[in-house]
């Protein structure tokens, strides 16, 4: 395979639901990070051959969010752009598609990434189109319906995490301990400025002033497992609980028995947040790196995708990561750092068991439970965070980024530091 380089990458700080970024459109967030990533790379917009950007909650945003991002970033009209829709994998899928474009010889430089403003997702009134003549009509929350709902089984993503709890025997205590650790790691990382290099300030209006939003606002300080153990379960267990009937697409080796099997164990504290943010990544061929004198951060050496039963969508990273590592010619023992998106503590624990993660290498600065999960951006965000952390660690040579995808899928990439 030809060499594929990640020239530069950055992200916005992540906003809370209804927080600092609620009034900043997704296309604006994307335009800000793309403009900045080109600036950081010392590149001109006209050097870009194509832009691919993930975004899930596109209702009411206008045609082709990626094209809007491209134009807002100052990329010429002559450069095509398209929006990638693979639910939570969209931002990472854009990187995979960018790599394929370069390998196919269609492009030399592709800007990839993702953007999402979950706070701004509108409500829809489907009946209004053809017949809401009188009486009450049902409104649809497009944020939940298009981003967080399993259409195959008609329940929330949180219920798929409860299915994983039942099959893998994951206790409430394990999940709360995992979630508290994520928050504690992020609290320490923010205090040490570990995220500063990867974050691009976003101008936001506060009353009459314009201020820079540049610190993730979702993390909580002083979180303990004992403290969050008081919260109630947030999602109903599936009708099949405590023994959900699923089709396994890989051999399960990490299943255990749990004394609280069949109970509600997923809470607001051990699940990821509902958030806003964007991330951008520049991919380039070896020829483009030489031609323009670019200084890459990392190589993209492998990627993979996989499918699982939608009822247990959270374990999608298992086949995806195995495929990515096989393509890269590495094993989990060769991986120095892992960014595994924390959609739920339940699925994160199951994935770690199945892949044999050394947890001291995983989400060393916390993950989506603490930082948040702007769904269309997260796949790119974890790559950005992974690479920036690798650059801070001389011993970190190779990294794995992976995440689960609603509908029963996963994506993963393997990178090597330059």
Stretches with model-predicted labels:
Residues 10-12, 22-32, 40, 174-286, ...:
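N-terminal extracellular/periplasmic Venus flytrap/periplasmic-binding protein-like
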Residues 160-162, 198, 206, 301-370:
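Active-site pocket-lining segment
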Residues 1-61, 65-73, 77-80, 160-172, ...:
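Conserved active-site "lid/cap" helical segment
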Residues 109-164:
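Flexible glycine-/small-residue-enriched beta->alpha junction loops
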Residues 46-54, 80-85, 110-115, 176-181, ...:
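Beta-strand segments within the central parallel beta-sheet cores of soluble alpha/beta enzyme folds
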């Amino acid at each position: 395979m030809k060499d594929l380089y990640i020239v530069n990458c950055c992200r916005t700080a992540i906003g809370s639901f209804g927080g600092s970024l609620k009034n900043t459109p997704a296309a604006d967030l994307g335009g800000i990070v793309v403009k900045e990533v080109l600036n950081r790379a010392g590149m001109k917009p006209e050097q870009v051959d194509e832009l691919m950007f993930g975004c899930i909650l596109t209702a009411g945003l206008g045609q082709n969010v990626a094209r809007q991002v491209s134009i807002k970033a100052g990329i010429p009209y002559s450069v095509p752009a398209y929006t990638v829709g693979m639910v939570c994998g969209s931002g990472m899928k854009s990187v995979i598609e960018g790599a394929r474009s370069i390998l196919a010889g269609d492009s030399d430089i592709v800007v990839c990434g993702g953007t999402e403003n979950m706070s701004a997702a509108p409500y829809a009134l489907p009946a209004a189109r053809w017949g809401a003549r009188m009486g009450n009509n049902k409104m649809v929350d497009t944020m939940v319906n298009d981003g967080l709902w399993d259409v195959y089984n008609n329940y929330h993503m949180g219920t798929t995490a409860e299915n994983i709890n039942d099959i893998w025997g994951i206790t409430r205590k394990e999940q709360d301990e995992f979630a508290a650790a994520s928050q504690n790691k992020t609290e320490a990382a923010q205090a040490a400025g570990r995220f500063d290099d990867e974050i691009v300030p976003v101008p936001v209006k506060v009353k009459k002033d314009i201020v820079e939003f540049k610190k993730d606002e979702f993390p909580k300080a002083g979180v303990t497992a004992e403290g969050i153990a008081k919260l109630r379960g947030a999602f109903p267990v599936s009708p099949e609980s405590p023994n959900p009937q699923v089709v396994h697409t890989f051999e399960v080796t990490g299943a255990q028995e749990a004394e609280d099997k069949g109970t509600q164990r997923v809470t607001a504290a051990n699940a990821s947040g509902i958030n806003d943010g964007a991330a951008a990544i520049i991919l380039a061929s070896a020829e483009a790196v030489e031609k323009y004198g670019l200084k890459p951060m990392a190589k993209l050496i492998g990627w993979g995708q996989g499918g699982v039963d939608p009822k247990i969508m959270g374990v999608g990273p298992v086949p995806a990561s195995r495929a990515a590592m096989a393509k890269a010619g590495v094993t989990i023992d060769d991986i120095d750092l892992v960014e595994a998106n924390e959609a739920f503590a339940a699925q994160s624990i199951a994935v770690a068991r199945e892949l044999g993660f050394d947890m001291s290498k995983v989400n060393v600065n916390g993950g989506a439970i603490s930082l948040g999960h702007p769904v269309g951006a997260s796949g790119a965000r974890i790559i950005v965070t992974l690479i920036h952390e690798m650059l801070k660690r001389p011993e970190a040579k190779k990294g794995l980024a992976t995440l689960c995808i609603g509908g029963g899928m996963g994506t993963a990439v393997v990178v090597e530091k330059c």
